[in-house]
């Protein structure tokens, strides 16, 4: 992604700090993986041209907001962040709290295994699904989530 370059100077600085402590970045990453798990990420981008395409994107977002499932592909939904309303709903504790980030047309669904986020592009006739999960058969699960949202 075009924004990924921003992390490079920070990673260089962090690697230098670790080296001063006698560690390598590889060691640190292995510790993180051991403690947190290995997450995989995938981006699905769908283009819908013209007025009908814009309406389809809006309908997908509206439907996803109003009919958020309690589980997806066997993964239990534990929380939902709707950046348009500025609210986070914790389904485990049945609590609603405010999101401190700016309002945006983004929905983020959390599972114990990670999250997915859905948002329309601000500059193109596209809608994007971000999948970040730590689970077996990641590619299959990610594709099934994509299909469930866009082929319904």
Where are the language model's segments positioned?
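Phosphate-binding and adjacent anionic-ligand microenvironments
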Residues: 1-119, 126-130, 137-142, 149-152
């Amino acid at each position: 992604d075009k924004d990924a370059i921003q992390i490079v100077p920070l990673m260089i600085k962090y690697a230098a700090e670790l080296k001063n402590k006698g560690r390598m970045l590889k060691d640190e990453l292995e510790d993180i993986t051991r403690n947190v798990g290995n997450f995989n990420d995938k981006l699905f981008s769908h283009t819908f041209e013209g007025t009908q395409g814009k309406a389809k994107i809006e309908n997908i977002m509206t439907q996803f907001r109003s009919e958020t499932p309690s589980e997806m592909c066997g993964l239990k939904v534990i929380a939902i962040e709707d950046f348009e309303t500025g609210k986070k709903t914790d389904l485990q504790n049945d609590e609603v709290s405010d999101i401190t980030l700016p309002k945006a047309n983004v929905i983020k669904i959390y599972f114990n295994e990670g999250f997915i986020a859905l948002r329309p592009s601000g500059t193109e006739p596209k809608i994007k699904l971000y999948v970040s999960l730590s689970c077996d058969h990641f590619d299959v699960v990610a594709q099934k989530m994509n299909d469930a949202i866009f082929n319904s």
